[in-house]
Every structure is written in structure tokens, then in C-alpha cells.
């Protein structure tokens, strides 16, 4: 016996259908024959940034007339068959930048002229692809650092020694030149030392770590130094499980991110940095060469209200030697990406409308609760 899907569902069936649609993690909307939104699930309301009981599709400011989405709706109505469209750009002032989606558009047989639209955001997939590219770039720096470090540092040491000897025999007016040679030699050696960090493949000690303890420690360091005049707030999920990691390296990661945020905020009187944690189920990353998928439910964010990151720099932000700072080396964020990648996680950056967010996604520890991690991670530093 088949159910008559052309008749209106009873109240119980309608309630179940609504619950099912609201449980779907993708935005779903239904458009009636007049182009009005007849239904939107919770994810759609979050996606569009509005709660709509009814509203014309063009009024959603997705695109002006002739947009790919509106054209797909017309095509489905005309042909009466579903259509898939991939990598559709829905970026707009309302939705923000980097709104790349895959669309599934299908007719609603029980509603003449009705069309259902399912949005699959590609932002996360594309960011993961970029993260893998960042790791490859970090590996290239690793190989370069490993092979060239000694070849560069040894002759530089000789040059510096020769400059120091010259300094003892030249006239006062020329000592500034020998001092310049020493200073520039020290600067290059310092850069090579930072590059050598990428080639350090020694295993590090990992244990269940309370991320809130790490963030609180970083906050204290920041407020006693470079961020003493900046308001730092936090919004933590107290039920968050522990992260299996090296505590010292996590401190290094978030101290770097908070320092970048403080430099972005600068001296503005309303400058603010916010630290947040949350549990986000449903994010899984495939492991290359296997069928295994790693779940990355732990989300740690550093937000700031600085001027933001230039759009043309965002895709390359974690590449080595990319920086907007006058005297920056461009290795800080590359090292952050390497550490997070070594822990099986990913890092991404969103920047728009004077708000920048660095988001770290990591796997949870299976061996201990957050309370256990608090006592374990407070026993002392780890290598």
C-alpha cells in the first residue's frame, strides 16, 4: 500500500516532516509558485540571517534578476525535473563573502509551481583543501630549512667574526658599517633559526589537555604584556571534552593568534579580542591513503574587531613568508598551521566587516574528560 503524497499531510505527519527538515544540517527552503518562501528550516534561517514566515525570493538579496539561483528555479519549474548546480557563488552584502554553495533544486509534486532548494556550503571543503595546500607549503619549508640551515649559518658565523675583528681596527666613522654587518648577520641567523623549527620532526609528548586552561594562560600572558590595554573576553563551552595535544605547543599557537589579534586591534579605544570554544559535531576530515575519517568537533576561536585581513591575502595567509607587517618574517602563521596539522586539526580564517576570526578545529581526546585534563595539564610543562 502506498501513501497518497498529493493530499495534505495530517498534523502528526506534518510535525514529523518539520522535525526531519529542521534536523538536516543544510539550509532547505521551499518556494511557492509566486516566488515566495513558503518554508525554511532552521539552518536556512541561520544561513540567510533572518527568520522568514514569508518573503519574496528576490527580496532575500541573494542576487539580482538573472542570478544562477533564480535561473535554476525557473528551469526546474519549466522542465519539472531536479537540477544540481555546483560551486554557485552567493556572496552578497547580506550573506557575506566566501558563500560558495552546491545547489539541489527540485519540484514539489504536491505543490504546483513549488520548488525546494537545498544548499550545500562548500566553504568548509574549500578551506580544508587550502589547509592541505598550507601543509604542503610547510613541508617545502621544512625541506629547505633542513638542507640549508648549516650551509647558511656556518659562513655567516665566519662573516660575523670577521666583522668583529675589523671593528677593532677601523676608525670610528667606519664602525657603524661593521656594526651593520653584525646586525644583519644576526637577523639572517634568527630567520634561519625560525625556519629550523619547521624541520623539527621529533615526537612530542601529548596528553588530554584542558583547552580552557591553555586559553586562560595565554590571556594572562597577553594582558601582562602586549595586550595590556585591550579588552579580552571569553565565551567557553564548559562541557567541552579534552583535546589530545601537547600543551606547550597549544600555548604557542594561541599566543601567536592573540598577538596577531592585538596587533590588528592596535590602539583603538574600542578594541576587543574574544576567545570562544564550542562543540561542533558533523565536521569530518578524510585521512589520505585510507578510508578513515577523523572527526573534528572541537572549535577554538580567536576573534578581533581590527580592520580585517585583505581579501587577496586570505587564501595565502598560512603560506610561509606571507605577511603584512613591515618587519615580519611571515613564518608565524605558517608554524601555527603546521602545529595544528601535526595534531590532526585544521585552521581557517574568516575576515569581513571589521571582524576577523581565526578558527581552529581539532579532534577530541577519547581518554579523558575536561576535569581529568585540568589536573593532568596542570602538572607542569611538556616537551
Swiss-Prot record:
Top-rank taxon, per record: Bacteria
GO molecular function annotation: ATP binding; hydrolase activity; phosphorelay sensor kinase activity
GO biological process: nitrogen fixation
Start and end residues of each Histidine kinase domain: 147-366
Principal subcellular localization: cytoplasm
EC number: 2.7.13.3, 3.1.3.-
GO cellular component: cytoplasm
Pfam family, one: HisKA
Localization in the cell: Cytoplasm
Keywords: ATP-binding, Cytoplasm, Hydrolase, Kinase, Nitrogen fixation, Nucleotide-binding, Phosphoprotein, Transferase, Two-component regulatory system
UniProt cross-references to InterPro entries, sorted A to Z: HATPase_C_sf (IPR036890), His_kinase_dom (IPR005467), HisK_dim/P_dom (IPR003661), HisK_dim/P_sf (IPR036097), Sig_transdc_His_kin-like_C (IPR004358)
Keyword ATP-binding recorded: yes
PANTHER family assigned: PEROXIDE STRESS-ACTIVATED HISTIDINE KINASE MAK3, SENSOR HISTIDINE KINASE
UniProt-recorded name of the protein: Sensory histidine kinase/phosphatase NtrB
Lineage, broadest ranks: Bacteria, Pseudomonadati, Pseudomonadota, Alphaproteobacteria, Hyphomicrobiales
Amino acid at each position: 500500500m502506498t501513501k497518497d503524497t498529493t493530499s495534505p499531510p495530517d498534523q502528526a505527519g506534518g510535525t514529523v516532516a518539520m522535525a526531519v527538515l529542521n534536523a538536516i544540517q543544510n539550509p532547505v527552503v521551499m518556494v511557492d509558485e509566486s516566488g515566495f518562501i513558503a518554508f525554511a528550516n532552521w539552518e536556512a534561517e541561520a544561513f540567510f540571517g533572518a527568520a522568514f514566515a514569508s518573503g519574496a525570493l528576490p527580496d532575500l538579496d541573494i542576487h539580482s534578476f538573472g542570478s544562477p539561483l533564480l535561473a535554476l528555479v525557473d528551469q526546474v519549474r519549466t522542465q519539472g525535473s531536479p537540477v544540481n548546480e555546483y560551486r554557485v557563488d552567493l556572496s552578497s552584502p547580506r550573506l557575506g563573502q566566501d558563500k560558495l554553495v552546491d545547489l539541489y533544486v527540485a519540484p514539489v509534486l504536491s505543490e504546483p509551481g513549488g520548488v525546494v532548494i537545498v544548499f550545500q556550503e562548500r566553504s568548509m571543503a574549500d578551506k580544508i583543501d587550502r589547509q592541505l595546500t598550507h601543509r604542503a607549503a610547510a613541508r617545502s619549508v621544512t625541506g629547505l630549512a633542513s638542507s640549508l640551515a648549516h650551509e647558511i649559518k656556518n659562513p655567516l658565523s665566519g662573516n660575523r667574526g670577521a666583522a668583529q675583528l675589523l671593528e677593532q681596527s677601523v676608525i670610528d666613522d667606519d664602525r657603524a658599517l661593521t656594526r651593520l654587518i653584525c646586525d644583519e648577520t644576526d637577523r639572517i641567523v634568527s630567520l634561519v633559526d625560525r625556519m629550523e623549527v619547521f624541520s623539527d620532526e621529533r615526537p612530542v609528548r601529548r596528553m588530554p589537555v584542558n583547552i580552557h586552561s591553555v586559553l586562560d594562560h595565554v590571556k594572562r600572558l597577553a594582558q601582562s604584556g602586549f595586550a595590556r590595554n585591550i579588552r579580552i573576553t571569553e565565551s567557553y563551552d564548559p562541557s567541552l571534552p579534552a583535546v589530545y595535544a601537547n600543551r606547550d605547543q597549544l600555548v604557542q599557537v594561541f599566543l601567536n593568534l592573540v598577538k596577531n589579534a592585538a596587533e590588528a586591534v592596535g590602539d583603538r579605544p574600542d578594541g576587543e579580542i574574544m576567545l570562544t570554544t564550542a562543540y561542533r559535531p558533523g565536521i569530518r576530515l578524510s585521512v589520505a591513503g585510507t578510508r578513515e575519517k577523523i572527526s573534528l568537533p572541537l572549535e577554538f576561536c580567536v576573534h578581533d574587531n581590527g580592520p580585517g585581513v585583505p581579501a587577496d591575502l586570505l587564501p595565502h595567509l598560512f603560506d610561509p613568508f606571507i605577511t603584512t607587517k613591515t618587519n615580519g618574517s611571515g613564518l608565524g602563521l605558517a608554524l601555527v598551521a603546521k602545529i595544528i596539522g601535526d595534531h590532526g586539526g585544521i585552521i581557517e580564517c574568516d575576515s569581513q566587516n571589521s571582524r576577523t576570526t581565526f578558527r581552529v578545529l581539532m579532534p577530541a581526546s577519547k581518554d579523558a574528560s575536561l576535569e581529568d585534563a585540568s589536573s593532568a595539564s596542570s602538572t607542569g610543562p611538556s616537551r
